């Protein structure tokens, strides 16, 4: 009998812990809406106790997306965290409190500096309290793969008796190997079914040894009923289990695993592309399922075989995962309906009334200039439109700029707006971008360091749109900025400014430019 595997996506919580991948509230909602289209069963929307911004994002996701998908958020085994989770997710139709507490010796002794019994009691008390708030509670035994098995089981048994409805077994540091992890899940599953066969057994793997997908599939083979993953395998260090790899592994090897998911496969590529666009973190070209070369064949022998029968060298088709529907070609005559459909296919909400009309007018201007508008052009239009909407009085806008470049003294003059104020300054630099960034830094008064600068072409021909991704460091934290424009110097300025605005949003830092620079 085929089992249905529950899929929890934790891109917005665990995935967002990647330096520079932080999203604002609107971006998180945008991505959560796409996860809803993807039809994941549970969205882990964040860690609400960590900041007011994360609390707000989780709350908005629960309110706007939680009508048909379960929403959860992470809590440590303390009352304040559990309260924050409850308050942020309670508007969802099927909310779930997720509690995490370590079980390995190193966690108990070094992290908590308590006895094993004391840590176990912390977990039991946390579950009992969470159950007074909501009926559904998941308990994660952090670092389970390095834990003493009998203590691990003692913890699981105690929290199940306290009311936990899901037990999640994490390979927190990616230490396990597939046969070992599969055996661990088999043993837990065997005991858990005898204890309470209504409790769901889940796994959460990390990719430090490149084994996250293999370990997750081994766990499913050995009785796991739920998997926790991220899109593109996004996550801190080497990343998390890749959702698309697990889902397609179960699909392609259905006879082997005798398990399936509710995920809409045709939304996989679209979801991956949206995440790449929002975070600015590109997928490696040879990444399974979602990489640019995942369905590319350059070998003559392979091409010959494919022409005779695609199944000679393809175990899945690009059409299955939505790769066939990504290329959109629009013209000025495409009309509102076609444009609206194109925007929605790329995972964005189109808005209504005046908002949509303003976006459509921008599309017509671009279509007149470029003649043919592709999917990346639509991405550009929508994100630039959204960015303009989100600018507030304490963030900077680019008013104008001028760059003069020569062999001696490249110079940039920049004028910024912040609310009703304007600021202007000129700087020289080692090239046009350095001069531009030096002028912006002087105006905003923040000592940010440029850590990474990348530029890519997003569309075709001499009118191609360039995308600039930058990463900056401020007070030890990494922030990202990205922008697109047919003028790459302008895109560079906007990306840098977006990174600085991310700093301001994160820190609530209301910087002032020097009076002499105004």
UniProtKB/Swiss-Prot annotation:
Sites where the protein binds Mn(2+): 14, 204, 206, 240
Alphabetical list of InterPro entries matching this protein: 2-IPM_HCS-like, 2-isopropylmalate_synth_dimer, AIPM/Hcit_synth_CS, Aldolase_TIM, LeuA/HCS_post-cat, LeuA_allosteric_dom_sf, LeuA_bact_synth, PYR_CT
Pathway(s) per entry: Amino-acid biosynthesis; L-leucine biosynthesis; L-leucine from 3-methyl-2-oxobutanoate: step 1/4
Domain of life: Bacteria
Ranges of residues in domain Pyruvate carboxyltransferase: 5-269
Location of this chain's protein in the cell: Cytoplasm
EC identifiers of the protein: 2.3.3.13
Gene Ontology BP terms: L-leucine biosynthetic process
Keywords associated with the record: Amino-acid biosynthesis, Branched-chain amino acid biosynthesis, Cytoplasm, Leucine biosynthesis, Manganese, Metal-binding, Transferase
Pfam family, one: HMGL-like
Cofactor or coenzyme needed: Mn(2+)
Entry's Gene Ontology molecular function annotations: 2-isopropylmalate synthase activity; acetyl-CoA C-acetyltransferase activity; manganese ion binding
Region (Regulatory domain): 397-518
GO (cellular component) term, any one: cytoplasm
Known partners and oligomeric status: Homodimer.
HAMAP family: LeuA_type1
Protein name per its UniProtKB record: 2-isopropylmalate synthase
Annotated gene: leuA
């Amino acid at each position: 009998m085929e089992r249905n595997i529950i899929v929890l996506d934790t891109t917005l919580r665990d995935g967002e812990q990647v330096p520079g991948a932080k999203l604002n509230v609107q971006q998180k909602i945008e991505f959560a809406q796409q996860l809803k289209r993807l039809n994941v069963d549970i969205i882990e929307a964040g860690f609400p106790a960590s900041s007011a911004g994360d609390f707000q994002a989780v709350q908005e996701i629960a309110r706007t997306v939680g009508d048909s998908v379960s929403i959860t958020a992470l809590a440590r085994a303390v009352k304040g965290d559990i309260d924050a989770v409850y308050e942020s997710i309670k508007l969802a139709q099927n909310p779930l409190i997720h509690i995490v507490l370590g079980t390995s010796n190193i966690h108990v002794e070094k992290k908590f500096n308590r006895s094993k019994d004391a840590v176990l009691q912390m977990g039991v008390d946390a579950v009992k309290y969470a159950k007074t708030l909501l009926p559904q509670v998941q308990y994660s035994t952090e670092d389970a793969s390095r834990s003493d098995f009998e203590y691990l089981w003692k913890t699981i048994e105690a929290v199940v008796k306290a009311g936990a409805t899901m037990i999640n077994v994490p390979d927190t540091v990616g230490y396990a190997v597939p046969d070992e992890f599969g055996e661990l899940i088999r043993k837990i599953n065997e005991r858990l079914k005898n204890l309470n066969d209504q409790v769901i057994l889940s796994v959460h793997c990390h990719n430090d040894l490149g084994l996250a997908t293999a370990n997750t599939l081994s766990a499913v083979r050995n009785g796991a009923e739920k998997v926790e993953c991220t899109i593109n395998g996004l996550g801190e260090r080497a990343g998390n289990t890749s959702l698309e790899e697990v889902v397609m592994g179960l699909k392609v090897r259905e006879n082997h695993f005798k398990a399936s998911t509710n995920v809409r496969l045709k939304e996989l590529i679209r979801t991956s592309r949206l995440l790449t666009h929002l975070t600015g973190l590109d997928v490696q070209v040879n990444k399974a399922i979602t990489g640019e070369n995942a369905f590319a064949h350059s070998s003559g022998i392979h091409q010959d075989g494919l022409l005779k029968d695609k199944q000679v060298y393809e175990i899945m088709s690009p059409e299955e995962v939505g790769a066939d529907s990504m290329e959109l070609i629009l013209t000025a005559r495409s009309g509102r309906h076609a444009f609206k459909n194109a925007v929605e296919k790329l995972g964005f909400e189109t808005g209504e009334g005046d908002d949509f009309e303003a976006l459509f007018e921008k599309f017509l201007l671009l279509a007149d200039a470029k003649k043919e508008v592709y999917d990346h052009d639509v991405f550009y239009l929508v994100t630039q439109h959204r960015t303009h909407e989100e600018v507030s009085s304490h963030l900077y806008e680019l008013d104008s700029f001028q760059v003069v470049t020569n062999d001696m003294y490249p110079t940039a003059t920049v004028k910024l707006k912040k609310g009703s104020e304007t600021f202007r300054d000129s700087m020289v630099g080692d090239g046009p971008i350095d001069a531009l960034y030096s002028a912006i830094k002087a105006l905003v008064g923040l000592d940010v360091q440029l850590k990474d600068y990348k530029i890519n072409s997003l569309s075709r021909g001499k009118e191609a749109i360039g995308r600039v991704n930058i990463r900056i460091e401020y007070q030890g934290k990494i922030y990202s900025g990205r922008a697109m424009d047919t003028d790459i110097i302008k895109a560079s300025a906007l990306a840098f400014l977006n990174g600085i605005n991310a700093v301001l949003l994160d820190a609530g830092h209301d910087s002032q430019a020097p009076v002499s620079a105004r």
